A protein has these predicted regions:
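FIC/Doc superfamily catalytic core
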Residues: 1-382, 390, 414-430
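Acidic, low-complexity, intrinsically disordered interaction modules
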Residues: 386-410
Length: 430
């Protein structure tokens, strides 16, 4: 029996004792994140949100097996938000449509949800009326049975059968009415319920997962009372896709007890906020760098390339990379780099190496004395820097894969690693 076949199936219940501590932790982390954002000016906040939205759009689509060009998405979002983008990539019509849905949801997050809005968003996901080469119903609720299956043709496994099409209109009316009411429980719990409830109705022929994640974000935005969105759950779901579908299937076959689902959902939300903290830290580091180097004279090319690396461009700083990014000769690149070394902006990572590479000097002080128990941890293919600042503040920052691999091979010093990911702490001592 599927969950929707039970009488009063949306009277979900759960064990508060199992999730109360998680709700408190999630709320505290969200509060700390927004507190940290007070250190950012408006332009930097906008850039942080743009980067978060870029990851959200790309990862949410990837969950459904759709690969989008990250630079196209980033360029589209930057244009809509009025942000200068040095690496503009003309977005496709499809990317533009998907981005507009996300921005529309953010801009109007306080407005009541309607059937018309949902149908408009779903239609924007499929501007040609096709999905995976097959025609689908767009801009309206589905009119046929919906089976969630996996496996090859002829040997499919049915994971879930959604409510019959003649029931969808009424089921969605109940959902929308509930969605628009003031929450009777924690907004974090409400967000998790909305996600589960919507995908269990599966009102559209395609696009339900992406819409469910947007609806979850809207409820969190209402709770935060903030149109700036700095965290999203899509990337974490994509990293743990098997767990996501497993817990979803388990709950949809259950008796209405959604404790396991909420536990998984809130833990995933917490992880997404931790990732957002890393992005904010990167922006704070960049701001800290430019404040320290405000009086340093650089050419336009030097400034542009430095900003690329400060924004997370994943490559070693070498004369070869510099020449490629600056569209200049290797000799010019060497002169650029040596000039910045002389000015204390860059330093040679391992002096005397046959193929020299360089590190950005965020803070000229050797930060290693301020940190202890520094290590790298891998979790679901993502690397994190774990360290303790001044013996009392635990730090956990997501690393670029290249930095993690270089550090573990001894090709990146601990000083450079801490400088790149933790220098912002020196500007905000505790």
């Amino acid at each position: 029996m599927y969950i929707h076949e039970r009488e009063n199936w949306t009277d979900f219940h759960w064990e508060n004792s199992a999730i109360d501590a998680l709700i408190e932790l999630a709320s505290r982390k969200i509060g700390l994140l927004y507190g940290r954002l007070n250190n950012l000016g408006f332009d930097n906040k906008l850039r942080a949100m743009a980067e978060n939205l870029t990851h959200d759009v790309v990862q949410s689509s990837e969950i459904e097996g759709i690969s989008l060009n990250t630079e196209e998405v980033r360029s589209s979002i930057a244009r809509h938000l009025g942000i200068d983008n040095l690496k503009y990539t003309a977005p496709s019509h499809y990317v533009e449509s998907v981005v507009k849905v996300m921005l529309d949801a953010i801009e109007h997050y306080m407005q009541p949800l309607t059937k018309e809005t949902l149908c408009r968003w779903q239609s924007a996901f499929f501007p040609t009326g096709f999905s995976d080469g097959f025609p689908i119903e767009v801009g309206c609720y589905r009119t046929h049975e919906e089976h969630i299956v996996s496996g090859i043709f002829g040997k499919e496994r049915i994971h879930y059968i959604a409510p019959a099409p003649q029931l969808v209109e009424n089921e969605m009316a109940n959902f929308i009415q509930w969605f628009n009411q003031p929450p009777s429980t924690s907004s974090i719990v409400q967000s998790g319920i909305a996600h589960l409830w919507f995908v269990s109705i599966h009102p559209f022929e395609d696009g339900n997962g992406r819409l469910a994640r947007i609806l979850s974000d809207i409820l969190l935005a209402k709770s935060d009372k903030n149109e700036f969105r700095f965290y999203n759950i899509s990337a974490e779901i994509n990293r743990n896709k098997k767990q996501y579908y497993s817990i979803l299937e388990q709950t949809q076959h259950g008796n209405g007890d959604i404790t396991s689902w909420l536990t998984w959902y809130i833990k995933t939300l917490i992880a997404s906020v931790e990732d957002a903290e890393t992005s904010v830290n990167s922006i704070l580091n960049k701001s800290f760098f430019w404040q320290r180097n405000a009086s340093v004279i650089m050419t336009d090319r030097q400034t542009q390339i430095m900003n690329m690396f400060l924004d997370g461009y994943e490559a070693k700083i070498t004369s070869k990379t510099w020449a490629a990014l600056g569209n200049c000769s290797k000799d010019t690149a060497i002169r650029d780099i040596q000039d910045l070394v002389a000015k204390g902006v860059l330093r040679e990572e391992f002096p005397g190496a046959k193929r020299p590479c360089y590190a950005i000097v965020y803070d000229p002080e050797d930060l290693t004395s301020w940190f202890s128990d520094t290590q790298i941890e891998e979790e679901n293919g993502t690397f994190y820097l774990l360290t303790t600042y001044k013996g009392k503040q635990n730090v956990r920052n997501r690393l670029l894969r290249l930095d993690a691999e270089r550090y573990m091979k001894g090709d990146l010093s601990q000083q450079s690693l801490l400088n790149k990911y933790c220098a912002y702490l020196m500007d905000n001592p505790k």
